[in-house]
């Protein structure tokens, strides 16, 4: 399997969230919004790649396109994350598996599919204490900046 290319530090990605991931009065989602789903885990196993949580390259995909591709009918909130911030967090906490990589959707010809990316390093390591893992997810969530509501 070819290695995925990591996005550069000047790039920005976004993630769609349903409102239940945003605590009342909070500026960013809670860390649970970044826990890889069973679908993320199954996809990684099938493809022989690291577990990836979906994010989108804002230069290639609009939030409306991402919402359509995912088939979301409910309102969503759009939060941006600067890749530079992810790289700095990775260095600070020494989580070398953390990266934002290109992962275009090839099974669809829908507009914006080429902007699909994966946020790696968010799955819990075998011997990682739950409190340390929760702190990691909360720190990632704090990198988010609200961009829109759709």
Question: Which ranges hold each PLM region?
Answer:
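Conserved NAD+-utilizing ADP-ribose enzyme module
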Residues: 1-13, 28-30, 37-53, 59-150
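Contiguous, amphipathic alpha-helical segments that mediate oligomerization or scaffolding
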Residues: 17-22
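Short, solvent-exposed loop/turn elements at domain surfaces
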Residues: 24-26
């Amino acid at each position: 399997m070819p290695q995925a290319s990591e996005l550069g530090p000047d790039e920005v990605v976004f993630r769609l969230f349903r409102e239940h991931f945003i605590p009342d009065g909070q500026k960013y989602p809670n860390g649970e919004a970044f826990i890889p789903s069973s679908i993320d885990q199954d996809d990684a196993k099938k493809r022989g790649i690291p577990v990836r949580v979906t994010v989108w390259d804002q230069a290639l995909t609009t939030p409306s396109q991402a919402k359509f591709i995912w088939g979301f009918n409910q309102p969503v909130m759009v939060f941006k994350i600067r890749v530079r911030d992810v790289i700095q967090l990775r260095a600070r906490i020494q989580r070398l598996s953390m990266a934002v990589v290109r992962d275009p959707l090839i099974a669809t010809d829908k507009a914006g599919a080429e902007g699909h990316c994966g946020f790696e390093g968010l799955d819990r390591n075998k011997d990682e204490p739950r409190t340390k893992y929760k702190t990691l997810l909360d720190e990632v969530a704090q990198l988010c900046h609200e961009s829109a509501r759709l």
